[in-house]
Every structure is written in structure tokens, then in C-alpha cells.
Amino acid sequence: MEPIHNPPPQTCSYSRPSTTYTSFKDASCGTKVTRIIIALFLIVISCGLILCAYTFRDLLDADYSAQEGPQQATKLLQQLDKVLTGPPLPIWDNEHLFQFSCLMQNKHRRVLPIDICNPLTKFNFLEYICNCLMTKQSVNVNETDMCELFCPPTCTPENYRRLLCTSSVFPFVMWHDPSADTQEAMLTKMDQTMSSGRVGNSHWVLVIVDIEHRCVTFFDSFYNYIASPQQMREQLEGLAASLGAIYPKEGGADSDQEELLSPFQVRIGSTVKVQSPGEFTCGAWCCQFLAWYLENPDFDLEEKVPTNPSERRALLADFISTTEQAMSRYSSLSWPTTD
């Protein structure tokens, strides 16, 4: 019987596959194409993530133009770099707008402070302004009883009546968010914005009614954020016609009735963008515009505002720094009293 010889146990050996790294220069044509496609794909993904990080407001604020030449585009980038340098400018909200209007009332006397307890939007501002001016008219002729006079919570009826009687310039601020398409949605969006503490897509614009000059002036630091200048003019012309009937021109007995009831003049105060992209300075620009208007109702905005973004920013920063301390006296939000 022959001995049985068992074969030696076989062992499994695992060999790690060798990976050869080649430079782009030494790679094959197919490898080069693959690497280029992957690189382009990663670039597109990165750009998409950057755009997602931007808020919708930032995208609206950005200026894009295919008509600018290379040199002009370089200048724009240099100016943008200058704008972004330095500390951010403070955000002026409704409380700041009220305080500044009180400061202007103290200086010019003919200005009615802004009532921030009644939020105005593009859906209700026409009716509200008409009602406010009709209230002034009835107060002037003593047709409104003190108990019937609506006044802001931080102002007494007696003081509000006196302010109405002595005022001829009525500034109104309008709040807007493009995502709201009804008055109810706009007010809900306003509450959400205030609760979050973030500006988001919200924006302030200014409407000035001047009885002495028979003029309605509209200002938007983005000039077309709510609507185009022509669309705003069409809306304001209806308001101007109503105001012309409320405050007819002075004339003799033989004066033409149609001429006496002629509409107020409508003026679009902003035909260019004065607010820089990435800055939330619409409230401060509204106050600056009001200050210029009270100095000279016929002023030209383009003559006041530099075309250079860094100079515009410096101008507004100087305006803010010189007025914030004086405004602080109205931080309690109490209306100024008439002497």
C-alpha cells in the first residue's frame, strides 16, 4: 500500500493593484479629455453653490451689462472694490425714518413727521395719502371734532391737530417686498421681516406731498424697484388729480373752475440708481433726499449724487454720521410739540 502524499496547503496571496499617476502633460488624449470634463463640471457646481449663497436681493442689486467695453468693466470692478471697503453703513428702518422726520420738523416747521404706526404699501398708499390730506383740510376749517381726529399713539390729539395745521410738506414712506402680491401678504411679510431681524428683499421708498408747491414727488434709491418710473407716474397722476380737487388754487370769482382744480405736478425724483449693490441703505437715502428737498424743492438729484460709487458711499456715510446724534433726541418715538 503506497503512502498517501497530501499536497501542501495553498495560500492565497492578495496583491494591491498598482496605481500609476501621470501628469496632465504625459497623460493620454482620452485621459486629458476626461480630466477637463471633470474640472469643468466641478467649476459649474462651485458657481451654482456660490449663486445659491446669494440672497435674491443681491441678485436684483447686481448690475449686468454686455455693452461695457473691457476698460469700462475694469473700472466698474475697481469702483466696486472701493465700495466694499470699510465698515458697512447702518440700516435705517422705520424708527430712524420717524426720528429724522421729527428732526426736519424741528428745523423747517412745515414738515409733518412720518406716521410709522400705519404701514404704507403700494396697495394702500394712494388712499391713505388722500385721507391724510383731507383730514388736514377739515382741521383747517374746523370741521373735524377732536374726538373724531385719528392721531398716532405717541402724539396727543391737540398736538397732532396743531402739527396738521402748520404743515405743508407731508413725507410718506412706503415698504415693499416683491414677493408679496396682496396687501395682506405684504403685511405678513413685513411682520416676518421684523421678527427675523433681516432685511431680505424689503425696500423703502419715499413720497412727498407739497401743498405750497402743488407737487407730488416720488423717490426710489433703486429708481425702479417697485415699478418703472413711468408706471409710478401713472399711479401718482391719479393722486395728483385728487389732491388738486382737495386743495384748489387760489383765485378770484371770475377764475376758471377747471384751472383752479388743476392736478398737482408729479415729479419722479430718481431716474438713476443711487444705492450701491450689496448695501441696505434705502432708508438713509430716503432721508437724504428729504433733506435736499426741504432745502430746495427743485433740486436735481443727479447733480447732488456723485457717479463714483465710493464717493456716493462717502457722501451718505457723512450724512448718517452728522444726523444720527441729533436724531437720538426722538428715540422715545414721541412726536415733537409745537410752540
UniProtKB/Swiss-Prot annotation:
The topology of this chain with respect to the membrane is: Single-pass membrane protein
Under the GO molecular function aspect, what terms does this record hold?
A: cysteine-type deubiquitinase activity; deNEDDylase activity
Where does this polypeptide localize?
Secreted; Host cell; Membrane
The transmembrane segments are: 36-56
- Record: active site: H203, D220, C282
The enzyme class is: hydrolase
Q: Name the GO terms of the biological process aspect.
A: protein deneddylation; protein deubiquitination; proteolysis
**Keyword match Membrane:** yes
Task: Write the signal peptide boundaries.
Answer: none
Q: What is its EC number?
A: 3.4.22.-
Q: Which family does it belong to?
A: Belongs to the peptidase C48 family.
Q: What does this protein do?
A: Effector proteins function to alter host cell physiology and promote bacterial survival in host tissues. This protease possesses deubiquitinating and deneddylating activities.
What is the protein name stated in its UniProt record?
Answer: Deubiquitinase and deneddylase Dub2
Q: Which gene encodes it?
A: cdu2
